A protein has these predicted regions:
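Conserved donor-binding/catalytic core segment of Leloir-type glycosyltransferases
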Residues: 4, 186-205, 211-214
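N-terminal strand-loop element at the rim of the active site
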Residues: 5-13, 17-21, 25-65, 148-153, ...
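Donor nucleotide-sugar binding/catalytic pocket of nucleotide-sugar-dependent glycosyltransferases
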Residues: 53, 136-174
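Short His-centered aromatic/hydrophobic patch
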Residues: 87-93, 111
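Aromatic "clamp/platform" in nucleotide-sugar-dependent glycosyltransferases that forms part
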Residues: 264, 283
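Short hydrophobic beta-strand element within catalytic cores of glycosyltransferases
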Residues: 300-304
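Conserved acidic donor-binding segment of nucleotide-sugar-dependent glycosyltransferases
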Residues: 316-328, 337-342
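A short, well-ordered alpha-helix in the C-terminal region of glycosyltransferases
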Residues: 330, 337, 344-358, 370
Length: 381
């Protein structure tokens, strides 16, 4: 098959990372073109087998940027004559549909967040319109969980659950606190609780709740935590004022130097390998690829569970502790359990690695190949 994958950038985003991973995996057996903005930073490794094409004009933002992208994408469609196009996130899915008018190219739209929201972070009207109305334009819409498929019901043409693929090779357990990576290098865990996400999205990521929970843990186990050297480290890019807000909260809660903000990091694998515990504190989360990545490197995971979505990641395996979103007390209790009980922590770490293998690209790309073949065959009938 000839496949064109369209995304707005190849940096600073989980969905964008998934788009690149999908392009790389499909390019092993198919002709794949990645249409994107090559003028921006490239954060993710792109296979030499993937043809990369720029479709964005040198305009930073606005209507002209997107109309220019539509024009260039249509030219690319005419030139390449793809069997199918995949849009990464709603805007790129939409421009695929507009650019392909009259060309008979089926479009698969990919959604990367939840189709419902908590009252504390309601879905905007524009987002709801995109998810439940614009998505009716597409041959297929992929979602990340069965929970989202249930929310959608029969409102769209066809909905398929497609988990995000894992980009990392799972580690192996060598001893109680000793692990080995895919290259055979051993690493040991440190007394670190790691969290990751864009700091400007602190409310969505629940970093305020995480800091409140951390304060509770420190208050209850201060001597033990200080003796063992436990720290909370938050990795993530800051573009506006997320960092300053969170730093002020650290001061208010008197957390001192027990919390570190690491900024955007390209060495996330090393951070996962160093961390004994990974915390996902989101108020809502469509999937949580960072959770799977952390599991693969032997982190004992503590996660909020937004209406069953993160429970789907853990499956039936005992590989992490779940708690309700926006509940600092429950999050604190879970963190305290894995930090103070080494036997529990090691069991969760071992099981997490095994569960992460379900999300390996080979498994996910087979599901994608089957879906794309069905979409192409249906359009040719």
């Amino acid at each position: 098959m000839k496949i064109i994958i369209v995304q707005s950038r190849v940096c600073f985003g989980g969905a964008e990372h998934v788009g690149v991973m999908l392009a790389n995996a499909l390019a092993e057996y198919h002709d794949v073109v990645l249409a994107t903005n090559t003028q921006l930073e490239v954060s993710y490794a792109i296979s030499d087998s993937v043809k990369v094409r720029n479709i964005f004009p040198s305009i930073p933002h606005g209507v002209r940027k997107w109309t220019g992208a539509i024009q260039q994408l249509r030219k690319l469609f005419v030139q390449e004559k793809p069997d199918v196009a995949i849009g990464i996130l709603s805007t790129c899915s939409f421009i695929c549909k507009v650019a392909g008018v009259g060309l008979g190219i089926p479009v698969v739209a990919t959604e990367h967040d939840a189709f419902e929201r908590p009252e504390s972070a309601p879905m905007s009207r524009g987002n709801a319109f995109s998810k439940f109305w614009l998505n009716r334009l597409f041959d297929v819409v992929t979602v990340l969980t069965e929970a989202d498929k249930q929310v959608i019901g029969n409102r769209l043409r066809r909905v398929v659950v497609m988990s995000n693929p894992l980009s990392l090779q799972p580690a192996t357990v060598e001893g109680r606190n000793e692990f080995k990576d895919a290259e055979g290098n051993t690493f040991a865990k440190k007394p670190i609780v790691l969290a990751a996400g864009r700091l400007d999205s602190w409310h969505y990521k629940g970093f305020d709740v995480l800091l409140e929970a951390w304060a509770k843990v420190l208050a209850r186990c201060k001597e033990n935590i200080e003796a063992e050297g436990w720290r909370l480290c938050i990795a993530g890019k800051d573009e506006v004022d997320g960092l300053s807000h969170l730093q002020s909260l650290v001061r208010k809660l008197e957390l001192g130097d027990s919390v570190s903000f690491l900024g955007f990091r390209k060495d996330m694998v090393r951070l996962y390998q160093e961390a004994s515990v990974f915390a996902l504190s989101s108020r809502y989360e469509g999937f949580g690829l960072v959770l799977v990545e952390a599991m693969s490197q032997g982190c004992a995971c503590v996660s909020t569970d937004y209406k069953g979505r993160q429970k789907e990641i853990f499956g039936d395996a005992e590989c992490g502790l779940l708690c309700p979103p926006e509940d600092a007390e429950a999050l604190a209790e879970a963190l305290q359990s894995v930090m103070t009980d080494a036997t529990l922590r090691h069991r969760l770490q071992k099981n997490a690695i095994e569960r992460s293998r379900f999300f390996m690209p080979l498994h996910i790309v087979k599901l994608w190949e089957q879906l794309l073949s069905e979409v192409v065959a249906a359009r040719k009938k």
